């Protein structure tokens, strides 16, 4: 059958149409592929528009299935380079840029000298000092142009967080104000697990960050001002990353915690954050503030040939030096102190930190703070033969060195030294060297960390400001630490940043167990909850069944608020519990007894004059030295080891002679001072009890007589009531005047510490040097209102009429 002729043309007609359709489909598919590629590229390399220009980040997956990916923006500039004329000056905002800036790699770190010999080992975590080779990889790229921050943004929403904007947590790294960088702490895990934006920052360190001449030439505190500038940048730009500028929490450990504490007291940071987490360090620690900045600046100037008499010329000379020459100078401060750190400049830090706390300068912030069980490990770790415990000689030397470096007054040292040894001797096991080692660690822990933290918590909570206190009692298993060590300084850091969830790293080379993973999840939940609501218990409950089949004991624990009366705190460990009055006896010793030891010293002198036994005759000890009535201690020398304790000098046991007598004398210990301490304390307590009972009896007897004479309240007229009130006010004023006169009369012969009023801060931070301590506002700056005086910097944005006269202090931010 033949095909119709017209149908022969159909294939020819449809061929162009098919070609056209295929071309359109191909173009559509190509466009779709390009679109998906762009979307994928945007997801892989997200771009954010800041106030200074666009930046490109990097989307990074995490090696744990329970953790979502995180967007990282690394090396974002928050200030102009502090170089040239900007050295030793407050930071300035960064310059804008065009195009898209790549922020996928870390920027340079601030100059520092990681030398084994120059590090303040006692104030640094073990994971820091034991990994200097690893740390060198983080700080190889050094430059004065170092004011950058790193931003870690989670990509998954939190069903518990009703606010579309995410809370922001800003970490201020530690390192004794001399070392460290925000680059070495990865905030990805904390950001992903807690659904918060985590930011780490670099700030100027050491000489470049804290040099001060004590006057207008170089005020100091540039590192603190860098942190404040970073917070200002965050307030302006974090909204572009999905962050909430009204929910910013700053947190830090060690020197970083002290910076956090100081920022809560500075008006320059007002409104830039709302909450603070202070881990193992406050502004009240002996190493938190440098009270002799001009002294160390002069030492530096001598070393580099800038010892000009005029401080302005000296600073100009230092400004023209190469930064490497400056940071390589070794300037060693007294133990427990710092050479370059925050100073009381009358501006950024307007007064002594304790005075500012007492005035309520930090009450507008919610605060969570705490300590680790064995913070003072590094102070004891260097003692010879500490693996087998601490010998009596080493114990005596450590206490003597401790007193000599912290308390600069010549009189009363013997009393203080013996009292400290008395308090930190386990009398039930006093001959055990391991027990002696444990109590020595406790001594340094209590003085340097626990007492300052409790004092800070008391001052913050006394008016009802939200305060939470913790004690960290866990640490990972690592070869970096001795087997006998407890949770030491900085041991909480890997748990805060979730390191156990991804396994050991070069910096935290621990053998993490499931318990470590569980505890890290618990800690991150507490920390991020506090950042979200100010309450570590809300909104996310403690639930770690996805990590550990065992029940999470933290589910049954509610972290209670801290108050000065109950002093409740959370014991963070594998057996959590809420307890009260953390190390109350030892804290009271440092906060209450030590500031008043000069009163007890007078009692000791009275007891010694009435019960003194005549000293032995010198002729009785032909080869020994007669013990003086007042025991004389060496200032820094280690007590000599007697021949009886030194095998190298042991003698024949059958040999007799004068040497045997010498050994016998030197191995004896005189407990007269301890006995005097005990008698004096007992006598003073008895005397106080007698006074209390006498006062109680007198008031009771007086009240009984007055009930017969006093008219009923209804018969008192208004004038009578007003008269009584006036008399009470006048009585209080007279008592205050007598109190002031008493304080003035004590100043002339005070040996240890004034009792009016008790000053815990300076008691802990007395300097041993001959140069007098800087009193608060000693280096307060010349007012800017003087003729020809230009404003020091652009940070002062507070108007003179901004403060309320109803606040506790003329410039207070106290919550009323």
UniProtKB/Swiss-Prot annotation:
Cell location: Cell membrane; Postsynaptic density membrane
Keywords (A to Z) from UniProt: Asperger syndrome, Autism, Autism spectrum disorder, Cell adhesion, Cell membrane, Disulfide bond, Glycoprotein, Membrane, Phosphoprotein, Postsynaptic cell membrane, Signal, Synapse, Transmembrane, Transmembrane helix
Residues in the Extracellular compartment per record: 42-676
Membrane spanning stretches: 677-697
Glycosylation sites: 102, 511
Disulphide linkage map: 110-146, 306-317, 476-510
Region (Interaction with NRXN1): 359-364
Extent of the signal sequence: 1-41
PANTHER family noted in UniProt: NEUROLIGIN
Protein name stated in the entry: Neuroligin-4, X-linked
Organism: Homo sapiens (Human)
Top-level taxonomy: Eukaryota, Metazoa, Chordata, Craniata, Vertebrata
């Amino acid at each position: 059958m033949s095909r119709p002729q017209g149908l022969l043309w159909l294939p020819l007609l449809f061929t162009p149409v098919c070609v056209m359709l295929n071309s359109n489909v191909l173009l559509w598919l190509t466009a779709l592929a390009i679109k998906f590629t762009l979307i994928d590229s945007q997801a892989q390399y997200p771009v954010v528009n800041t106030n200074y220009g666009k930046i490109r980040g990097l989307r990074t997956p995490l090696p744990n299935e329970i953790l979502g990916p995180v967007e990282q923006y690394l090396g974002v500039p928050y200030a102009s380079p502090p170089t040239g004329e900007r050295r030793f000056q407050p930071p300035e905002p960064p310059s804008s840029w065009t195009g898209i800036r790549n922020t996928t790699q870390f920027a340079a770190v601030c100059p520092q000298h990681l030398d084994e010999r120059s590090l303040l080992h006692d104030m640094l975590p073990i994971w820091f000092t034991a990994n200097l080779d690893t740390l060198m990889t983080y700080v190889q790229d050094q430059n004065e142009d170092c004011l950058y921050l790193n931003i870690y943004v989670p990509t998954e929403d939190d069903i518990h967080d009703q606010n579309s904007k995410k809370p922001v947590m800003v970490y201020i790294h530690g390192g004794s104000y001399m070392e460290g960088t925000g680059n070495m702490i990865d905030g990805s895990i904390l950001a992903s697990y807690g659904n918060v934006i985590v930011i780490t920052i670099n700030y100027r360190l050491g000489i470049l960050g804290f040099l001060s001449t004590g006057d207008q030439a170089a005020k100091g505190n540039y590192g603190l001002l860098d942190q404040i500038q970073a917070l200002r940048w965050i307030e302006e730009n974090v909204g572009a990353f999905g962050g909430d500028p009204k929910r910013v929490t700053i947190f830090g450990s060690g020197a970083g915690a002290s910076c956090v504490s100081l920022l809560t007291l500075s008006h320059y940071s007002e409104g830039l954050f709302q909450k603070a987490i202070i881990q193992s360090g406050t502004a009240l620690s002996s190493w938190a503030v440098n009270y002799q900045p001009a002294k160390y600046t002069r030492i530096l100037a001598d070393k580099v040939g800038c010892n000009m008499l005029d401080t302005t010329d000296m600073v100009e000379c230092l400004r023209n030096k190469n930064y490497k020459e400056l940071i390589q100078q070794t300037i060693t401060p007294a133990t427990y102190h710092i050479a370059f750190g925050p100073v009381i400049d009358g501006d950024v830090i307007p007064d002594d930190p304790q005075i500012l706390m007492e005035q309520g300068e930090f009450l507008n912030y919610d605060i969570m703070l705490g300590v680790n069980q064995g913070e003072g490990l590094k102070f004891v770790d260097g003692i010879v033969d500490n693996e087998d415990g601490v010998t009596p000689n080493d114990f005596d030397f450590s206490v003597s060195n401790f007193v000599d470096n912290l308390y600069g007054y010549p009189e009363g040292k013997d009393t203080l030294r013996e009292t400290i040894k008395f308090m930190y001797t386990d009398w039930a096991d006093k001959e055990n060297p391991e027990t002696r080692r444990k109590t020595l660690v406790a001594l340094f822990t209590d003085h340097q960390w626990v007492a300052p933290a409790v004092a800070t918590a008391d001052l913050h909570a006394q008016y009802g400001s939200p305060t939470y206190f913790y004690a960290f009692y866990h640490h990972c298993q690592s070869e970096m630490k001795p087997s006998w060590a407890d949770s030491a300084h900085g041991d909480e850091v890997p748990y805060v940043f979730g390191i156990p969830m991804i396994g050991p790293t070069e910096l935290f080379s621990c053998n993490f167990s499931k318990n470590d993973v569980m505890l890290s999840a618990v800690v991150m939940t507490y920390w991020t909850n506090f950042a979200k609501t100010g309450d570590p218990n809300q909104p996310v409950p403690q639930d770690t069944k996805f990590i550990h089949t065992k029940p999470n004991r933290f589910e049954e624990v509610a972290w209670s608020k801290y108050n000065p009366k109950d002093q409740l705190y959370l014991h963070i460990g594998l057996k959590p519990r809420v307890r009260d009055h953390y190390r109350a006896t030892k804290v009271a010793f440092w906060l209450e007894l030590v500031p008043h030891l000069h009163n007890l010293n007078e009692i000791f002198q009275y007891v010694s004059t009435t019960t003194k036994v005549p000293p032995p005759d010198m002729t009785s000890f032909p080869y020994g030295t007669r013990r003086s009535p007042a025991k004389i201690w060496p200032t820094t020398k280690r007590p000599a080891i007697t021949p009886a304790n030194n095998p190298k000098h042991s003698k024949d046991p059958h040999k007799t002679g004068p040497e045997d007598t010498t050994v016998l004398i030197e191995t004896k210990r005189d407990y007269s001072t301890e006995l005097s301490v005990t008698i004096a304390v007992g006598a003073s307590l008895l005397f106080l009890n007698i006074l209390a009972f006498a006062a109680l009896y007198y008031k009771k007897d007086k009240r009984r007589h007055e009930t017969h004479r006093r008219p009923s309240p209804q018969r008192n007229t208004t004038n009578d009531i007003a008269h009584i009130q006036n008399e009470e006010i006048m009585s209080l004023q007279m008592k205050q005047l007598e109190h002031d006169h008493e304080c003035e009369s004590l100043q002339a012969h005070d040996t240890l510490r004034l009792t009016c009023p008790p000053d815990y801060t300076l008691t802990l931070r007395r300097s041993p040097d001959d140069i007098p301590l800087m009193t608060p506002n000693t280096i307060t700056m010349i007012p800017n209102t003087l003729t020809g005086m230009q404003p020091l910097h652009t940070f002062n944005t507070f108007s003179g009429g901004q403060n309320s006269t109803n606040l506790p202090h003329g410039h207070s931010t106290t919550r009323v």
